[in-house]
């Protein structure tokens, strides 16, 4: 179990309350697929993701980005039990989808970049970033737990 300070809980909750999952999710997944093109192999069912323009205009990419952020909302709501919250999702990504667990970290970085770009230094302060990065690290660890 992770020990969260009251300040960390408040920072995560406050930041999450400002995030539009319909904006940040698609941006983050788009960024992942463009900046780290080897991740595209996990999204073959999404149709054309072979060019930046195709990725930017792909509705399946946008929808899955929203889905990813919905998953993060579950973690925000279950800060004290993120490991169990993500157990089935971790198992699915490991056993069915065969996603390299390092990609979770890479996507988390893309999410942070998008959040920082959206909110800037007035909202995404160093203290908020510290709590947010800790949160994402716990999520990434939980997603990687079912890997052998």
From Swiss-Prot:
SUPFAM superfamilies assigned: Globin-like (SSF46458)
Metal-binding keyword on record: yes
Amino acids binding heme b: 64, 93
GO cellular component: blood microparticle; haptoglobin-hemoglobin complex; hemoglobin complex
Pfam families: Globin
Family annotation (Gene3D superfamilies): Globins
Main function: Involved in oxygen transport from gills to the various peripheral tissues.
Protein name: Hemoglobin subunit beta-A
Organism this protein belongs to: Seriola quinqueradiata (Five-ray yellowtail)
């Amino acid at each position: 179990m992770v020990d969260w300070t009251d300040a960390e809980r408040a920072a995560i909750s406050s930041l999450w309350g400002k995030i539009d999952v319909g904006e940040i999710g698609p941006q983050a997944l788009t960024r992942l697929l463009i900046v780290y093109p080897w991740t595209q192999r996990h999204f073959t069912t999404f149709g054309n993701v072979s060019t930046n323009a195709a990725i930017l205009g792909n509705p399946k990419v946008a929808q899955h980005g929203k889905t990813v952020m919905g998953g993060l909302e579950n973690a925000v709501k279950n800060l004290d039990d993120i490991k169990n919250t993500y157990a089935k999702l971790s198992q699915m990504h490991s056993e069915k989808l065969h996603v390299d667990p390092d990609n979770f970290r890479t996507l988390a970085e893309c999410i942070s970049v998008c959040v920082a770009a959206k909110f800037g230094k007035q909202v995404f302060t160093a203290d908020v970033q510290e709590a947010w990065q800790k949160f994402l690290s716990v999520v990434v660890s939980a997603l990687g737990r079912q890997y052998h």
